[in-house]
Amino acid sequence: MKPGAFQIAEGTITINEGREIREVTVKNTGSRSIQVGSHFHFAEANGALLFDRELAIGMRLDVPSGTSVRFEPGEQKTVSLVEIRGRKTIRGLNGMADTFIDERGKEKTLANLKQAGWMEGVIR
């Protein structure tokens, strides 16, 4: 095998197998395209996106690593979300979570999203 060469296994790889999956319908209420990456905490995605943010707390897009989903202005689509694993600690991003995602962390995140006005899908 040459340095840098790829060695691909045969068969099908199923990503996020055995993890909790949720579907959520998302609408871009803004005037610009919005792109969300594979490992972004979906509940904290752009405030112009209208969807059930409470359902999305502790979840990310169920897409291959390094990819994203784009939402055009006015577009509505259903996406699959998968639970964030590992230590379930969310830091940075839009500062709505910045916590460990347990019941208390979910309540804190939900309160921050409501206070910011992000539950309505409009930027204030």
UniProtKB/Swiss-Prot annotation:
Keywords: Cytoplasm, Hydrolase. CDD domains: Urease_beta (cd00407). Signal peptide: none annotated. It comes from the Bacteria. It is found in: Cytoplasm. Its EC number is 3.5.1.5. One of its GO terms (cellular component) is urease complex. Its main location: cytoplasm. Pathway: Nitrogen metabolism; urea degradation; CO(2) and NH(3) from urea (urease route): step 1/1. Belongs to the urease beta subunit family. Heterotrimer of UreA (gamma), UreB (beta) and UreC (alpha) subunits. Three heterotrimers associate to form the active enzyme. This is Urease subunit beta. The gene is ureB.
